């Protein structure tokens, strides 16, 4: 039997469990098999700054006195990753075509999620929870609301950065480059290399974490950086097992027994897709049906040595614009590129359907992912709203955000955003309602109704199912939104809605008149 004990005078020895011996957060150690290699990852609290928690291992041998365990420290690692020497770059994404119409007036990372958060809060919070507080956010299309949210939440929202900073870098036209828009993920970083390089040198940055702003997951990035350091990798790609239905939407990787990436293909199809199948039996401890996940996909999360990043963007691959489609397929041939498999919950919010499903999944029991974790909280803009007010309502499997006002309504399997108003007799099922960023008083609501207008929120006796309702939408009385004809794709912008993958999407600030049937 073995024990793990933090090298802390106030800590006590606790049993070490291998995968399968314990469940959930009770596991203190898990083994991750990559091919023929076994990588041991200690699940322990890391000290931010210069200190790092170490461990001692107690081993009972056949001749040992079991009443007097002998401790020996473990010194297999020579270098520990220091969060103070790590910087993060969060890519704000492109035009957000796949999430349209939710991205018609906002950047993808600014899309509301989980009732009161924005997608940008996911990588930002993961950074803070990992001890990484030197962050750059690259923005481009429809970035006004994203910039506003970042400012309110992270630049003026009370989060203490100590020696850290958050800087927003918007796409800018340069004198020698008439086309100011980012041409790809690598080009986005390259265009601001003059700012980044100066920052890296001043702060002794050794490693750079590159992140996406359109994913839902919880990760300690310093665990990824530590593996990057242990492997002495030039580039480390965070990967996840996926099924065949989505494989062609991602960059796929193959790696050898040491975890070194030997092949990278961006969004392969046909024979190329088939050639990227791998034996995922090494994930049997984490995946029930390993045959369902025959591919390993890049999560779009990378760790690079600072010097390697500067070299590939300024010199070696200065003409290439994108990491996934151009740089990584070449880098695996010329650099030490390693894979790190992530088996916890991860969802790429790349389409209306995946966005819708991921939000509603938050209401299921037990949920695959939840925002409730006091040790690794997710931050968002402080709004100082009152608690939700519910009068004679029936609520089942739902998330209700602050500031809501419900009266004698029924809500099931739905996520309701901040400051939402749902009136008497309403029925909502399988609905993602983003809420409102403004209040209309009872007097204002009564006046609008008297004038034959529609106030913000949902009017009396309205029935809604399988729907996304964007911010500040006005839905009248006796409306039915159910898509009973099963239409998959349809555009009705003049009427205030679209249909994507069979899901009705009510536009931001749209007005749906009384008695409308969709």
Swiss-Prot record:
> In the UniProt annotation, what is the result of changing residue 171 to I?
Reduces activity more than 3-fold
Q: Which reaction(s) are listed as its catalytic activity?
A: alpha-D-glucose 1-phosphate + ATP + H(+) = ADP-alpha-D-glucose + diphosphate
Q: Say which domain of life the source belongs to.
A: Eukaryota
What GO terms are given for molecular function? ATP binding; glucose-1-phosphate adenylyltransferase activity
Name the enzyme group at the top EC level.
transferase
Q: Which residues are connected by disulfide bridges in this protein?
A: none
Q: Where in the cell is it found?
A: Cytoplasm, Cytosol
**Pfam family example for this protein?**
LbH_GLGC
Q: What CDD domains does this protein map onto?
A: ADP_Glucose_PP, LbH_G1P_AT_C
Protein's job: Involved in synthesis of starch. Catalyzes the synthesis of ADP-glucose, a molecule that serves as an activated glycosyl donor for alpha-1,4-glucan synthesis. Essential for starch synthesis in seed endosperm. Is essential for both catalytic and allosteric regulatory properties of the cytosolic heterotetramer enzyme.
Give the similarity note: Belongs to the bacterial/plant glucose-1-phosphate adenylyltransferase family.
Self-association state and partner proteins as the record states: Heterotetramer composed of two small and two large subunits.
- Listed name of the protein: Glucose-1-phosphate adenylyltransferase large subunit 2, cytosolic
Question: Which organism encodes this protein?
Answer: Oryza sativa subsp. japonica
Identify the coding gene: AGPL2
């Amino acid at each position: 039997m073995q024990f793990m004990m933090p090298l802390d005078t106030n800590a006590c020895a606790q049993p070490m469990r291998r995968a399968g011996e314990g469940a959930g957060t009770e596991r203190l150690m898990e083994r991750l098999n990559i091919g023929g290699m076994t990588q041991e990852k200690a699940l322990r609290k890391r000290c931010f700054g210069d200190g790092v928690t170490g461990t001692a291992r107690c081993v009972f041998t056949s001749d040992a006195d079991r009443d007097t365990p002998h401790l020996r420290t473990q010194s297999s690692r020579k270098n520990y990753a220091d969060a103070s020497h790590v910087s993060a770059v969060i890519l704000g994404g492109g035009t957000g075509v796949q999430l349209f119409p939710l991205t018609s007036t906002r950047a993808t990372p600014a899309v509301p999620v989980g009732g009161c958060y924005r997608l940008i809060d996911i990588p930002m919070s993961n950074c803070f929870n990992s001890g990484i507080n030197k962050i750059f956010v690259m923005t481009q299309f429809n970035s006004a609301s994203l910039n506003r949210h970042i400012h309110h939440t992270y630049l003026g929202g009370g989060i203490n950065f100590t020696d850290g900073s958050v800087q927003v870098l918007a796409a800018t036209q340069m004198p020698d480059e008439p086309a100011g828009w980012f041409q790809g993920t690598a080009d986005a970083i390259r265009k601001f290399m003059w700012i980044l390089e100066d920052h890296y040198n001043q702060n002794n940055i050794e490693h750079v974490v590159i992140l996406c702003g359109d994913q839902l997951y919880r990760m300690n990035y310093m665990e990824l950086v530590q593996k990057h350091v242990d492997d002495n990798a030039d580039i480390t790609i965070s990967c996840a097992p996926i099924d065949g239905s989505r494989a062609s939407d991602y960059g796929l990787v193959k790696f050898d027994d040491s975890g070194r990436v030997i092949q990278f293909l961006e969004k392969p199809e046909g024979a190329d897709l088939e050639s990227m199948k791998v034996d995922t039996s090494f994930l049997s401890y984490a995946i029930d049906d390993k045959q369902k996940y025959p591919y390993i996909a890049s999560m779009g999360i990378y760790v690079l040595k600072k010097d390697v990043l500067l070299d590939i963007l300024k010199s070696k691959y200065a003409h290439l614009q994108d990491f996934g489609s151009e740089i990584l397929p070449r880098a695996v041939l010329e650099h030490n590129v390693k894979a790190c498999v992530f088996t916890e919950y991860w969802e790429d919010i790349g389409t209306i359907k995946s966005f819708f499903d991921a939000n509603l999944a938050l209401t299921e029991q037990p949920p695959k992912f939840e925002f409730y974790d006091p040790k690794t909280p997710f931050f968002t803009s402080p709004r100082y709203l009152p608690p939700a007010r519910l009068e004679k309502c029936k609520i089942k499997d739902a998330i209700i955000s602050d500031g809501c006002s419900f009266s004698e309504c029924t809500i099931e399997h739905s996520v309701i955003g901040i400051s939402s108003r749902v009136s008497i007799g309403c029925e909502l099922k399988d609905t993602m309602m983003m809420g409102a960023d403004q209040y209309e008083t009872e007097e204002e609501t009564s006046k609008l109704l008297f004038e034959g207008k529609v106030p913000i929120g949902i009017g009396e006796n309205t029935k809604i199912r399988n729907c996304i309702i964007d911010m500040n939408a006005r839905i009248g009385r006796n409306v039915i939104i159910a898509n009973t004809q099963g239409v998959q794709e349809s555009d009705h912008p003049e009427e205030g809605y679209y249909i994507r993958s069979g899901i009705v999407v009510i536009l931001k600030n749209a007005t749906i008149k009384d008695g409308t049937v969709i």
